[in-house]
């Protein structure tokens, strides 16, 4: 029987918007040619404050056109205390923004789905074979998390690609554990390993209070090949397994959309940029990004600068309907078993009688058509 599967990513900073959009676009392309038995829903989890305060209407319209469901998430209980408690370990990574990745603990609350496949916004699936991941472990339980070993410490898993079974009891246990425990790395990867991975939890009595059944299922590395891997990468292995790589994960501070130097002239970085250009071209956005690293990868600047919002750029167009977008956020009706989750999430979907010039009908309208109607080609 077909499962209801959510393929999710998390947006906790507008800096990752280019990654989230490109990821969604790539997933849509690949799903068109993949043989998938499950019912797939592309979801974006986004922090409530970020969604309400930092995105403009046209940016939201583009997000809505690429994701079937936008799930507005609240901060975790005592999240600020957890961030402060983990500050020292997080400083070792020199990545303070990763404190917000603790929000991934909300994934287990998505009980309207049978299974959740989580992908970081800085990942890029390469081919339709990537979706075979959904068939690898048909008997996965709520106590198991499937993930790829981390290249920096293979006894731990990398949280850029996660396969899990949503469960409210598990969500509560994980979030309680998160509040009480200092993460190995100050972020989600450490705490998830300490919760699910017995190797990382030497306090057995703490682990057993949750469940003795906790298990990390090791996925093949080809489902989450991290780059750059200076000092780690095995060139012979990359050459041997190249045709079998399913997904690339651009780890570290600099992303394909944030830097353009010869140091990052790798094939996979170029592939990501090519995919981004394709997205903007098909959405008729290319003309609006001629001076930005966000859309014009050939810029001579080496470092990413915060671009003007999409609204500012799109308002330079001649179409009046580019200037006004009415967005009504409503809650999706859920059955009784999902009401407890609904209290924690606001699910955005189109209203039955949209007031804007754009109509988003996921079931009957091709996603590309929706994008092109939301962002019509500028008059020349």
Curated annotation (Swiss-Prot):
Biased composition (Basic and acidic residues): 341-351
E.C. number(s) listed in UniProt: 2.4.1.186
Start and end residues of each stretch annotated as Disordered: 331-357
Gene Ontology CC annotations of this record: cytoplasm; vacuole
GO annotation, biological process: glycogen biosynthetic process
Binding-site positions, UDP: 10, 16, 95, 120-122, 249, 252, 255
Site keyed Important for catalytic activity: positions: 104
The reaction(s) this protein catalyses: L-tyrosyl-[glycogenin] + UDP-alpha-D-glucose = alpha-D-glucosyl-L-tyrosyl-[glycogenin] + UDP + H(+); [1,4-alpha-D-glucosyl](n)-L-tyrosyl-[glycogenin] + UDP-alpha-D-glucose = [1,4-alpha-D-glucosyl](n+1)-L-tyrosyl-[glycogenin] + UDP + H(+)
Binding sites annotated in the UniProt record for UDP-alpha-D-glucose: 10, 16, 95, 104, 120-122, 158-159, 185, 188-189, 252, 255
Compartments where located: Cytoplasm; Vacuole
One Pfam family linked to the record: Glyco_transf_8
Glycosylation sites: 230, 232, 367
Annotated positions binding Mn(2+): 120, 122, 249
Keywords for the protein's UniProt record, in alphabetical order: Cytoplasm, Glycogen biosynthesis, Glycoprotein, Manganese, Metal-binding, Transferase, Vacuole
Signal sequence residues: none
Cofactor(s) it depends on: Mn(2+)
Record GO terms (molecular function): glycogenin glucosyltransferase activity; metal ion binding
PANTHER family registered for this protein in UniProt: GLYCOGENIN SUBFAMILY MEMBER
Similarity comment: Belongs to the glycosyltransferase 8 family. Glycogenin subfamily.
Function, in words: Self-glucosylating initiator of glycogen synthesis. It catalyzes the formation of a short alpha (1,4)-glucosyl chain covalently attached via a glucose 1-O-tyrosyl linkage to internal tyrosine residues and these chains act as primers for the elongation reaction catalyzed by glycogen synthase. Capable of transferring glucosyl residues to unbound acceptors such as free oligoglucans or oligoglucan derivatives.
Quaternary structure and interacting proteins, as annotated: Interacts with glycogen synthase GSY2.
Name of this chain's protein: Glycogenin-2
Organism: Saccharomyces cerevisiae (strain YJM789) (Baker's yeast)
């Amino acid at each position: 029987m077909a499962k209801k599967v959510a393929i999710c990513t998390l947006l906790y900073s507008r800096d990752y918007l280019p990654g989230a959009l490109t990821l969604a676009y790539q997933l849509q392309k690949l799903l068109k040619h993949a043989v998938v038995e499950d019912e797939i829903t592309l979801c974006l989890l986004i922090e409530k404050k970020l969604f309400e305060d930092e995105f403009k209407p046209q940016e939201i319209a583009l997000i809505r056109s690429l994701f079937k469901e936008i799930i507005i998430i609240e901060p975790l209980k005592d999240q600020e205390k957890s961030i402060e408690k983990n500050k020292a370990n997080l400083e070792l990574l020199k990545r303070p923004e990763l404190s917000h990745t603790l929000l991934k603990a909300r994934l287990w609350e998505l009980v309207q789905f049978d299974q959740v496949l989580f992908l970081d916004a800085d990942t890029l699936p390469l081919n339709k074979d990537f979706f075979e991941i959904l068939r690898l472990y048909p008997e996965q339980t709520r106590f198991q998390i499937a993930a790829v070993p981390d290249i920096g410490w293979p006894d731990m898993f990398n949280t850029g690609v996660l396969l899990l079974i949503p469960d409210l009891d598990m969500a509560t246990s994980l979030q309680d554990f998160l509040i009480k425990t200092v993460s190995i790395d100050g972020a989600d990867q450490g705490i998830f390993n300490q919760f699910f991975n017995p190797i990382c939890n030497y306090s057995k009595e703490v682990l057993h209070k949750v469940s003795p059944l906790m298990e990390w299922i090791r996925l093949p590395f080809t489902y989450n090949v991290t780059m750059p891997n200076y000092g780690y990468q095995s060139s012979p292995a990359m050459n041997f397994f190249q045709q079998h790589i399913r997904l690339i994960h651009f780890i570290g501070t600099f992303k394909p959309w944030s830097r353009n130097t010869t140091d990052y002239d790798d094939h996979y970085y170029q592939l990501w940029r090519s995919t981004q250009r394709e997205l903007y071209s098909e959405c008729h956005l290319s003309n609006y990004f001629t001076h930005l690293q966000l859309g014009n990868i050939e810029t001579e600047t080496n470092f990413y600068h915060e671009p003007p919002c999409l609204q500012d750029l799109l308002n330079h167009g001649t179409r009046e309907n580019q200037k006004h977008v009415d967005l009504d956020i409503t809650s999706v009706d859920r059955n009784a078993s999902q009401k407890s989750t609904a209290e924690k999430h606001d699910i955005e979907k189109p209203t039955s009688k949209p007031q804007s010039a754009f109509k988003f009908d996921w079931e009957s309208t091709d996603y590309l058509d929706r994008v092109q109607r939301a962002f019509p080609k500028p008059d020349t």
